[in-house]
Amino acid sequence: MRVKGGSITRQRRRRWLKLAKGYWGHKSIGFKTAKQAVVKSWTYAFRDRKQRKRDFRKLWISRINAAARNQGISYSQLMYKIKQSNIEINRKMLAEMAVHHQSDFENIVKLAIAKSA
């Protein structure tokens, strides 16, 4: 007896094409290229979830460094003095303060310098 799987095949292909909706060119129309594009996009998404963490850390360090240099101290010296003075604050919060709450950031820098000296 011949097995006809037309409806199942259509469902499977429709599912892949739905995932590829919005892709450019044949990647959103053709089943094979759409499937390849979706799998590739998952690969990029997995890789870039890791990369995002590194990118944000770089951004925070750049912002802290710029604000610290306005206070006359380098990033590495500031972080060393913060660790020495047992100030429990992470880079994300320091960067946020450096951008949006400059006076509080200045107070932390002064406190770190005073405690470590």
From Swiss-Prot:
Keyword RNA-binding set for record: yes
SUPFAM superfamilies, A to Z: Ribosomal protein L20
Record has Transmembrane helix as a keyword: no
UniProt cross-references to InterPro entries, sorted A to Z: Ribosomal_bL20 (IPR005813), RIBOSOMAL_L20_CS (IPR049946), Ribosomal_protein_bL20_C (IPR035566)
GO molecular function, one term: structural constituent of ribosome
Pfam name, any one: Ribosomal_L20
Example GO biological process: translation
GO cellular component: ribonucleoprotein complex; ribosome
Keyword terms, alphabetized: Ribonucleoprotein, Ribosomal protein, RNA-binding, rRNA-binding
UniProt similarity note: Belongs to the bacterial ribosomal protein bL20 family.
PANTHER family: 39S RIBOSOMAL PROTEIN L20
Its biological purpose: Binds directly to 23S ribosomal RNA and is necessary for the in vitro assembly process of the 50S ribosomal subunit. It is not involved in the protein synthesizing functions of that subunit.
UniProt-recorded name of the protein: Large ribosomal subunit protein bL20
Organism for this UniProt entry: Mesomycoplasma hyopneumoniae (strain 7448)
